[in-house]
């Protein structure tokens, strides 16, 4: 990986961290430890490795990211917002009643979320019918 690529990924990860702080400030709660410990990896996946398109979130040949530890949902929301899957203003609704950004990801509420996952150790994975994962 080139130095310029690494620099860009670090800058993007820093923006994603600010997105997490934005959600924490708006909601007053969240799992920051798990989120911050995985933000570099998830940023590198979405911005360097994965073949995804925010303008076509249901594209059949896309790569899929499954967050099995659903309590780390803020990392996924932060990166999806930075990637352009939804407006960043939605981050301000994290954890609020009827928000698309629940404490655990719900694939029926937000583009880019590939699976609904629960809390550890009770994690369950719900995939869409006929999914090719």
Label the model's feature ranges.
Residues 74-86:
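Alpha-helical support elements that line or immediately flank enzyme active sites
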Residues 123-128:
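Conserved small/polar residues in nucleotide/adenosyl-binding loops
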């Amino acid at each position: 990986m080139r130095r310029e690529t690494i620099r860009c990924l670090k800058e993007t990860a820093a923006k994603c961290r600010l997105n997490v702080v934005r959600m924490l400030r708006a909601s007053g709660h969240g799992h920051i430890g798990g989120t911050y410990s995985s933000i570099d990896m998830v940023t590198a996946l979405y911005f360097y490795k994965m073949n995804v398109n925010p303008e076509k979130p249901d594209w059949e040949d896309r790569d899929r990211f499954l967050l099995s530890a659903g309590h780390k949902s803020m990392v996924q929301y932060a990166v999806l917002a930075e990637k352009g899957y939804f407006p960043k203003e939605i981050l301000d609704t994290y954890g609020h009643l009827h928000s698309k950004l629940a404490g655990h990801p719900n694939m029926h509420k937000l583009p880019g979320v590939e699976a609904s996952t629960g809390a550890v150790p009770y994690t369950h994975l719900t995939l869409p019918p006929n999914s090719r994962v």
